[in-house]
């Protein structure tokens, strides 16, 4: 690896940093850039229908600032801005944002697109990075700064073209992470001198990690230094715009907020140039999982995903935090066992969510518990038992869980694939209640006095009708005696469990019998019926069919 072709970047030496001792206790201001930064990164940019679907979804989720396009860069973006203004589709409490480069023709075209809007953020930018000044523009620092201040002056002068509109300004020194920190500050302060913000009408200074160039802690150092030194701090909103080139955009945003930033721009599930923008959904749900109101409504995360996938024509990864198909799923046996016990411990109602391996309750994002546990060859008894409990109301005794999980594992090892809940049920019924069982209980008559219980049971044995009579100290013991005397079926009942059924069957009771053969081997039988007596007798017959 040619690592010697690269060098580390340290934006500032900040030995007295304070951000590590801060905590995230409230949500920043959110701005979605799905319709602009996200859209420009797509293989196939959104058509009007997809843009509208995304815009509607962002409003439903509670975004109050939405960057809706780059109207001077393309006719479709211009038309979309005009559509949502002319059709009155922007709620009173939502501010749209439009992007423009610091070029006079583009700024004028941008203002033309805004006639009739009640409030708008005009976001103008130019690249200030050392590399782009040298390689792209061939300009010195003063020349690049003048581009920014000239744009600010023009923007202010064009306010008169839309007297009904409240204008808010945002300036980005693009490639902030590749710009000398003192120079980025100098340019931002110069822009602020033109805009003349106040605490009531602040200027947004957006500090993009246009390319993520260093670790999140260094980004936080840069943000804290900037917040300390920027003029008019009480009249400035410091905004973050992290990209994910190093895979740490979420961490960079979180540490940047700790360092003093007020606002974050990002996209749903991180769509954006190259490796993407910061994922606002992950940021919001990270706050949520720590007991902080995210100030976004993500109670139907699957709908948000479906809209994003439709609009972007890109899939959301199965492992994507909070939203991926598998993020609430455990295949590992030990994980499944811990989840099963955790779910039982908190019950249906709880004050505080505490379940192993599940950082949040899936129901809080609109998910169900259905996919929490899925079974493959890595799974153990806990996962199988959990699915039988949730799908069919069965509470298998622990020893029976071990026995049956081996049956399931044999199948998963043979196929090498996941096994579905319905397939697990098929294995269960085939094992314990097969339709073609050798012995089948047709009916029974039980009588008892103070000394004994007697049973007359009508059976079908290998297709032949058989009557079994037995006597014992209870119905199970009596049936065992009858089977032993008349059919030479010899085993004893080692353990017995029963419970009412709550789901998944027309039967109302289930019984489990652990049988022990004369050689010391053990196995289980299961019976289900409308009465607990019949269920217990069915369990004995099940064990008799499975005798080893």
Residue ranges and their predicted role:
Residues 214-348:
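Catalytic alpha/beta core domains of metabolic enzymes, predominantly
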Residues 132, 207-209, 237, 265-273, ...:
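Short beta-alpha connecting loops at secondary-structure transitions
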